[in-house]
Amino acid sequence: TALGVVNSYKIASASKRMLAIGLGAEDFRTDMRMERSEDASEILFARNLISLNAHAAGIMAMDYVYSNIKNTEGFRADVKLGKQLGYTGKSVVHPNQIGVVHELYTPTIKEIESAKEILNAYEDALKNASGVTSLNGKMIDKPMVTRAMSILSYAKAAGMEV
């Protein structure tokens, strides 16, 4: 509901046992008297806020259920957007959607190799008593290192060799 979205940080941080939160898109649309659009633009703000508040509370953000099971291209685009918005995963309503979610949320070989390069460059910089380094012309800093570690963690969780 609208109140749930407004209070999403309070909900996300209400208990140490809380693992994830997500948007009930249809409930939200109904409460807000919104018509569902093909691109779900009417719920973009709520999706952003839920993801932001989940991360602020230190828990996972699970993206909403995409209910048009026949629109595979729309679903794929929606999963990509959810990942871009910081979602940790996506709820599904049909078994045919699982493969796309796994494909798009599992790190690619290229992402894994890049993460390894970043961590190696950072470790080399630390060995040389320098906390600052670059790789391929890009500065490597703590947020990049944290992201690289996260990518490798996701890859391990997916059963990939890293």
Residue ranges and their predicted role:
Residues 1-162:
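Expand to "…catalyze enediolate/carbanion chemistry for C-C bond making/breaking, isomerization
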